[in-house]
Every structure is written in C-alpha cells, then in structure tokens.
C-alpha cells in the first residue's frame, strides 16, 4: 500500500492507494496539525472519501479529526459528523449524522457509541451506537433503535433494541425487540 501525503498545499490532502494502484480513500482538510514530541495529528474540517472498488463512494465530513498515531488507520471524528453513501449515479443511498465516530479506513469500518440518525430514501431511523461495515455492506444500530418509514400512501413506525440495514438489499431488519431479548427476526 502507498500513501501519498502533502501538507504544504491548500487544502491539505492525503491519498491511500492499494497494491493495484487504485485509490482506497482520500482525506483532505483545511489544516493538518502535527504535534511535536507526539505521534498525534489533527485535521481541521476533514473531508474523507472511501471508494468501494471504483463503484460507490462514502463521503465523510466533520469539524475535527484526531489521529492518535498519525498513521491514518484510526481516525476519531468529532462535531457535526456526517456519512453519506452515494451510488454510481451520485444519488444518496444512506445519510448518517452523529456527534462523534471512529473511522478505520483500511478495514472500511465506522463505529460510534453516540446517538445517531440514519436517513434512507424511504425512512428515518435513530438509535444509540452504530457499526457501519462498508466492505460487508451493512449498518447496525446497537441500541434504542426507532425507525419511521414512509411511502406515498402511508407511514409505519418500528422500535426495538437493534436494527440492521443491508446496503445491497436496501432494507432494514429488526434484530431484537425491546423487553424480549430472545426474539430475533
């Protein structure tokens, strides 16, 4: 893997490529701060694009990013964190809003324990905690899941402990109902 890095240009940017020379992800921001006597670096107004085998893209933005080891394997995002997955036609498939999250670019994994809102073309789902596995194609709400779906003719509400959104099928599944830990749908 190769990482191209340039912090002297405006805006600051970095690009991660794989062994085949294809871009895995890009990260840019208004400013990169590297702290003396520390491995830590911070990015102000980060914008990250994770590419899925040249198909869809995940666009990730926040007000602040922290990389504790400056290796871009674990990036802590805070303040106004947004994830937007676009299809080949640049249509938003899923939009995730939260206050903080950790992105693991090489694993194509996103995690948070914060309150999260997920918007799809026909629903709005909220909950606490989230795991988004880009490679496997799912988004999982970890607790207090509540979904409101709507069509032209009606709306429907579903609540439970955990819910899973399949990015390929574009559908939600209730994993656990509240007050009934043995129920899996």
Q: Where do the language-model regions lie?
A:
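Mature-chain termini and adjacent capping regions
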Residues: 1-185
